[in-house]
Amino acid sequence: VPVWDFDKAFATEAFRFVRVRYNSIGGYGPFGKWFTDYPDSDLNFSFRLQQLTTMNVHPEPLYLDLTDPKIFDYPFMYMIEPGFIWLSDAEVLAMREYFERGGFIMVDDFWGEEEWYNFYIQMKRVFPKREPVDLPLEHPIFHLVYDLEKKPQVPSIHNWMRYGVTYERPDAKEVHYRAFFDDGGRMVMMICHN
């Protein structure tokens, strides 16, 4: 487990990696798909962020339900494998309020048209008058820290080692980076699909 210096006096001002816990169809034992790679990937992200930036980064990631009022204390949240997410009405309202109050959610690691369709339907409940926008390679987000020459597709290590391909299923060969924006043009959700 990586460790780094952390000034606990500034714990509430530090960046803290927060994962969204949600209900889904399917999952892993008593945990849903939201639990994939937890807490290792969250800790790795936090460690690398403090290593590569001058940010004060909290060393203990956490997960929160969308209906937990603590979500408003964290401007960045992460959602993994949401292809079969199922939001309650209360979660839809909480997510919408989170975005209206300045929050941002990064969505990652879901594959294929069936998962996209279900995710899209759930997000249309949050954003009934908005459509996700496909982000072109020229978008600044692909050039902020590293100047990317192509949109990366990150496969599971098993697929890469077994088949030498960067997609996980036949209907997931094309990588998509999409986003939802608010009325002011602020990106509120980045969606990494395929």
Q: Where is each model-derived feature located?
A:
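Active-site-proximal beta-strand/loop segments in catalytic clefts of secreted hydrolases
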Residues: V20-N23, T67, M79-P82, R101, ...
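Loop/turn elements at helix/coil->beta-strand transitions in domains of secreted/extracellular proteins
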Residues: E13-F15, F72-M77, E100-I105, R130-E131, ...
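An acidic, glycine-rich "communication" segment
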Residues: Y28-G29, E114-N194
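Extracytoplasmic/secreted proteins, especially bacterial periplasmic and envelope-associated proteins
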Residues: D40-N44, R48, A90, A94, ...
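Aromatic-Pro/Gly-enriched surface loop or interdomain linker
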Residues: V1-F76, I80-G83
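Short alpha-beta junction capping motif
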Residues: F17, F76-W116
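Short, low-complexity, polar/charged sequence segments that are solvent-exposed and flexible
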Residues: T36-S41, R96-F99, R125-V126, K151-V154
